[in-house]
Design a protein with these regions (language model features):
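Helix-centered, glycine/charged polyanion-binding patches within enzymatic domains
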Residues: 134-191, 195-198
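C-terminal domain-tail junction helix/linker
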Residues: 188-195, 200-226
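Mobile genetic element proteins and their domesticated derivatives, centered on retroelements
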Residues: 17, 31, 47, 76, ...
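Basic, short loop/linker segments at the boundary and entry of helix-turn-helix/winged-helix-like folds
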Residues: 1-23, 39, 43, 48, ...
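DNA-recognition alpha helix
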Residues: 27-40
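Two-metal-ion RNase H-like nuclease active-site motif
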Residues: 69-82
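Short, basic alpha-helical nucleic acid-contact segments in DNA-binding proteins
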Residues: 49-71, 148
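Active-site beta-loop-alpha junctions of metal-dependent nucleic acid enzymes
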Residues: 102-124
Length: 226
């Protein structure tokens, strides 16, 4: 499938712009300046539209390609401010720090945790263990899941120090707080960021970071010869 058909700019320009924004802590205007220095004149609002469109495409392709998970998961929620209001990002990672899934919600409650865990179960099945913090909503969600026959073989652990990995993993996302304009755009942007970080982490785990290029990785993911 040609994901770049009908665009005014060449696909290489779009890939570089989207890759810069999702990989590095840059604003849309800063990406615009970097492209301008390379002789490419593109407005920051156009870059914004590209990021919103292709973040969702990349996340879908990444999820489709990576359906396996390890026996141990870590799940947590963090606060993200969007236009002055707090929202809640649920994230789950495996033992190597690779992102399994994310979910951005307006509320932090049992129903949101239940729905997210149910979605994880549908995608990956049951892990041997899940490590979370001691939030009451998570404990209630697990009880509700057990009552419908889900996660019956999974040990739910709430030892605080075991969850340090995912708490550290929140930081790059939270640094972008000031750029999130709505729940929808924040969700799209975070999906793109998680995809690129997931690719980076997987390459690091496999020992193939030498010569890492975000543009090349996006091309590979979208089926374009690198």
């Amino acid at each position: 499938m040609n994901h770049f058909k009908g665009k005014q700019f060449k696909k290489d320009v779009i890939i570089v712009a989207v890759g810069y924004y999702l990989r590095y802590n840059l604003s849309y205007r800063e990406v615009q300046e970097l492209l301008y220095d390379r002789g490419i004149n593109v407005c920051h609002t156009t870059i914004y539209r590209w990021v919103q469109e292709y973040s969702k495409v990349l996340y879908y392709l990444w999820k489709k390609k990576n359906r396996q998970s390890f026996y141990s998961w870590k799940m947590d929620e963090t606060y993200i401010k969007i236009k002055g209001r707090w929202h809640y990002l649920y994230r789950a990672i495996d033992a190597d720090g690779l992102t399994l899934d994310i979910w951005l919600r307006k509320k932090w409650d049992t129903q949101a945790a239940y729905a997210f865990l149910k979605r994880l179960h549908k995608q990956f099945g049951e892990p041997k263990t899940i490590v979370t913090d001691k939030a009451p909503s998570l404990g209630s969600a697990f009880k509700k899941l057990l009552s419908v026959g889900l996660y019956t073989k999974t040990e739910h652990r709430t030892v605080k120090y075991l969850n340090n990995l995912i708490e550290q993993d929140h930081r790059p996302i939270k640094r972008r707080n000031k750029f999130y304009q709505s729940l929808r755009t924040a969700s799209s942007t975070i999906k793109g960021m998680e995809t690129i970080r997931g690719i980076y982490k997987k390459n690091r785990r496999n020992g193939t970071l030498f010569g890492f290029s975000v543009s090349t990785e996006i091309k590979v993911l979208t089926g374009i010869p690198a």
